[in-house]
Amino acid sequence: MTNKNAYAQSGVDVEAGYEVVERIKKHVARTERAGVMGALGGFGGMFDLSQTGVKEPVLISGTDGVGTKLMLAIQYDKHDTIGQDCVAMCVNDIVAAGAEPLYFLDYIATGKNEPAKLEQVVAGVAEGCVQSGAALIGGETAEMPGMYGEDDYDLAGFAVGVAEKSEIIDGSKVAEGDVLLGLTSSGIHSNGYSLVRRVFADYTGEEVLPELEGKKLKEVLLEPTRIYVKALLPLIKEKLVHGIAHITGGGFIENVPRMFADDLAAEIEEDKIPVLPIFKALEKYGHIKHQEMFEIFNMGLGMILAVAPENVDRVKELLDEPVYEVGRIVKKENESVLIK
């Protein structure tokens, strides 16, 4: 018995692993940008920081996954957008700190290497990288029989970006009177899916609920997370934004306070939030308390910006998309977020 046969008999298909690498090369090539050094397949991805032209570079990194949204991708056998979700969760976090994404790495663990399926996953990762301007410079695909079921996989990612030291957004400039501007989300994004799956556990995904404006439930649930990088970078370069909150797990209540000091609070006017139909459906069919929705989901706004009043018009001009003025920064009395 050769080592190869022994490994195959233990459930690891080395040849399938090689096929995955060949299949994903064309997708990785889409993500090339200035600064990338070396080719896919080396022991480490390389990037020449001097190519960015940043005078006082600060590296900002982030890592994340997509939670149990993956279980819906597996259930519905749709794998071509979940990679974009993974990239979005990482790059949206680092752009909130003022970083331009430079490169990305992914990690996929699976019970059985299925090259066609894994190519779809990486194609989604590459699409997310293209949308955010990050190069996909490396990754790992681990076949782990016994750890995962044959149809199961997990996905995580790692993003590294750069910011000028003077352009870092750490919340220290957020001040009383700053205006809170919201940018629309594409849907649920990639958090709260354990609850989402419970609410719709008895649904096939083919249903067209009256709240969903003609779309199938599975299409809405797997709508990829919006990537905000290209919208926000011009604002960061002009130093127009005092704070940025990426509205992910914990919704408004947990994430908005992360962009300002402890003596401040966010006063938000609920009637100015463009609540998406899926959130109305979740609240209705899940019998979820209205206030709790804001503790879990983005409700239709994936990014909240704190902007000085005199800069609001310029920010809206640069964004060239619907921007929602949803509240202001006030002195803290009790709660960090007040939804009125």
Curated annotation (Swiss-Prot):
SUPFAM superfamilies: PurM C-terminal domain-like (SSF56042), PurM N-terminal domain-like (SSF55326). Keywords: ATP-binding, Cytoplasm, Ligase, Nucleotide-binding, Purine biosynthesis. Pfam families: AIRS, AIRS_C. GO terms for biological process: 'de novo' IMP biosynthetic process; adenine biosynthetic process. It catalyses: 2-formamido-N(1)-(5-O-phospho-beta-D-ribosyl)acetamidine + ATP = 5-amino-1-(5-phospho-beta-D-ribosyl)imidazole + ADP + phosphate + H(+). CDD domains: PurM (cd02196). Disulfide bonds: none annotated. Its EC number is 6.3.3.1. Pathway: Purine metabolism; IMP biosynthesis via de novo pathway; 5-amino-1-(5-phospho-D-ribosyl)imidazole from N(2)-formyl-N(1)-(5-phospho-D-ribosyl)glycinamide: step 2/2. Belongs to the AIR synthase family. This is Phosphoribosylformylglycinamidine cyclo-ligase. It comes from Streptococcus sanguinis (strain SK36).
